[in-house]
Amino acid sequence: MTTAPIDNIRNFSIVAHIDHGKSTLADRLIQITGGMTDREMAGKEQVLDSMDIERERGITIKAQTVRLNYHAKDGKDYIFNLMDTPGHVDFAYEVSRSLAACEGSLLVVDASQGVEAQTLANVYHALDAGHEIVPVLNKVDLPAAEPEMIKQQIEDVIGLDASDAVMISAKTGFGVPEVLEAIVTRLPPPKGDRTASLKALLVDSWYDVYLGVVVLVRVVDGVMKKGQRIRMMGTNAAYDLERVGYFTPKMTAVDELGPGEIGFITAAIKEVADTRVGDTITDDRKPITEMLPGFKPAIPVVFCGLFPVDADDFETLRAAMGKLRLNDASFSFEMETSAALGFGFRCGFLGLLHLEIIQERLSREFDLDLIATAPSVIYKMKLNDGSEIEIHNPVDMPDVVRIQEIDEPWIEATILTPDEYLGSVLKLCQDRRGNQKELTYVGARAMVKYDLPLNEVVFDFYDRLKSVSKGYASFDYHLTDYKPADLVKMQILVNAEPVDALSMLVHRTRAEGRGRAMVEKMKELIPPHMFVIPIQAAIGGKIIARETVRALRKDVTAKCYGGDVTRKRKLLEKQKEGKKKLRQFGKVDIPQEAFIAALKVDS
């Protein structure tokens, strides 16, 4: 393949909400430009989504790239570098880095659904990156498609001129050649100096069994060659380049990558954690002094405990997590023990979808049955002695008398919903301690902005939002800041013993409702024992809710036919003594489903 002059390179990404046809459009572009033959494409959809879970859920998790050759109508040959970015809020940082590697974006909007919350968030990311944006209306062949209305919506909501939007159906291929021409004529070429010192952006990285860590890079200035010694400026580690190349989508090795090009490098790097997304790569012999802007390490936001249902699976779980960590540096874990659940891990995630995906991959790829404890966030606590601590596990919370103030993280949520569900959506946000910031109407849809505590969102907010809006509302959020909160640690006691896996930090106003719902659920699922079992929810020494599991009754007087009443009484007293002793020393077996159900209750 020839290296084209920099003016003939176009780097672009496709921005879209989940399910609006982003990966399908990418498939068509690859097919038309001959990136893969029709035979290779046959029976294969979403070529760039390599994980099964990406295909099934119809989402893109890792950023992927493909280089395409295109012979345009003006008679020139162009090189297109297409970045397929994640569309979900949890991976917003990966999106921002992928966008930083490009100069333009195709904004794909479903002509039957319109603009969704995540479309908005990603368009703003693209505008922040200084992108030229070409609107593309997909699925125009559907009976429910309303292209003219959606064009107006794009102008009203995003403020983009959509009068010359490209009309396509990615599924059938209709209109896709016009998209290719629009990329040539409407998107700008990259800028870069071939003679300058090497400066490249680390876009993404993943682990390959044979090659070690494969790093996706965008060269800004200079040249990357095989055998060159490079330095990562964020970690200050140096490596010798072993392979340089690009994806077509197959891995293709070349001698060098020049300015404006996107490709991959391998350099015997052992761990993905050594390659931080957004880092700057330079030449070890002629280093540059300034890093590319926008680099920040991935910080976990949501935490939860993962425990194997079968204690024998602990080592398998440890190995499985190690393997996932090879490919996902933003996933962190440390060992923890729980009196109720045994050995497990405390894990950190970028957000709720990230947590779900990791859990699903553990159960699917490694065949593990897991129990997840209640998700929690990072709380900042100011203590009376003037020190500050951060905790994400309710078990680690210091004694209440030592705490001066607890601060919790807040988010700004953008929710788009059809107006008939607006009342239910507003009620849900109010119930979750939200403060409404703004409400605007776009046609028959409302856009609401709310400030919400992250603590209230991580639990089941997304599921509840989908159910109150019949699945039509879409939701996007970003962290804003920490605010003081009246939070208390609620414990669940079974037979007067605290169950550590069920402790959680809740707002004082919601503690009673939450506690009551949990103990009622536990009562249904804990089987009767030979003695009475009290199930209580407590804050400190105060019991706020209680349910009782009645004892099994064995008829000890069945053998007495007639005779004195004292005979019966003696047997009953003996049974009572035995039950008292049992209650003192007897162990209550809490079934796994009781844990799972208690953590899923809705207060």
From Swiss-Prot:
Mode of membrane association: Peripheral membrane protein
Main location per the UniProt record: membrane
Cross-referenced InterPro entries: EF-4, EFG_III/V, EFG_V-like, EFTu-like_2, G_TR_CS, LepA_C_sf, LepA_CTD, LepA_IV
Transmembrane domains' residue ranges: none
GTP-binding listed as a keyword: yes
One GO BP: positive regulation of translation
Binding sites annotated in the UniProt record for GTP: D19, H20, G21, K22, S23, T24, N138, K139, V140, D141
Stretches assigned to the tr-type G domain: 7-191
Protein origin, superkingdom: Bacteria
Keywords: Cell inner membrane, Cell membrane, GTP-binding, Hydrolase, Membrane, Nucleotide-binding, Protein biosynthesis
Enzyme class: hydrolase
Subcellular location: Cell inner membrane
Catalytic activity: GTP + H2O = GDP + phosphate + H(+)
Enzyme Commission code(s) on record: 3.6.5.n1
Family according to the record: Belongs to the TRAFAC class translation factor GTPase superfamily. Classic translation factor GTPase family. LepA subfamily.
Function: Required for accurate and efficient protein synthesis under certain stress conditions. May act as a fidelity factor of the translation reaction, by catalyzing a one-codon backward translocation of tRNAs on improperly translocated ribosomes. Back-translocation proceeds from a post-translocation (POST) complex to a pre-translocation (PRE) complex, thus giving elongation factor G a second chance to translocate the tRNAs correctly. Binds to ribosomes in a GTP-dependent manner.
Identification of the protein by name: Elongation factor 4
Organism of this sequence: Rhodopseudomonas palustris (strain BisA53)
